[in-house]
Amino acid sequence: MAREFKRSDRVAQEIQKEVAVILQREVKDPRIGMVTVSDVEISSDLAYAKIFVTFLFDQDENVIEQGMKGLEKASPYIRSLLGKVMRLRIVPELRFIYDQSLVDGMRMSNLVTNVVREDEKRHVEE
């Protein structure tokens, strides 16, 4: 029977969980603020990890840019903490990437809600 998930998928899920906890509890950089780890993609050799993040309540590009700089600066520290909590031969090099999809999804949801309201108003007026 074949496995449902590759090892890299399982490691990526664990990294997502652990990095989220580390960002919440250990990283004290004020530039980072409320950050959410939305996804992790890891290379097949487990040497590199792309960590996709979003910043809650902040859509300002300057705040996002400062937050990303804070994450990049904290990356070695996060990697060392990750190495302590996960038993991996090689702890992947972390690369943080801003995930625009959550913001786009919220914007699309708001647009749909507004269109539905306008449509309901038209039907009530008729």
From Swiss-Prot:
Cellular localization per UniProt: Cytoplasm
GO biological process, one term: maturation of SSU-rRNA
Chief localization: cytoplasm
Keywords linked to the UniProt accession: Cytoplasm, Ribosome biogenesis
GO cellular component: cytosol
Molecular-function GO terms, alphabetical: ribosomal small subunit binding
PROSITE patterns in alphabetical order: RBFA
Pfam family for this entry, one: RBFA
Domain of life: Bacteria
InterPro entries tied to this protein: KH_dom-like_a/b (IPR015946), RbfA (IPR000238), RbfA_dom_sf (IPR023799), Ribosome-bd_factorA_CS (IPR020053)
Similarity-based family: Belongs to the RbfA family.
Function (record text): One of several proteins that assist in the late maturation steps of the functional core of the 30S ribosomal subunit. Associates with free 30S ribosomal subunits (but not with 30S subunits that are part of 70S ribosomes or polysomes). Required for efficient processing of 16S rRNA. May interact with the 5'-terminal helix region of 16S rRNA.
Cross-referenced PANTHER family: RIBOSOME-BINDING FACTOR A, CHLOROPLASTIC-RELATED
Subunit and interaction comment: Monomer. Binds 30S ribosomal subunits, but not 50S ribosomal subunits or 70S ribosomes.
Protein name: Ribosome-binding factor A
Originating species: Histophilus somni (strain 2336) (Haemophilus somnus)
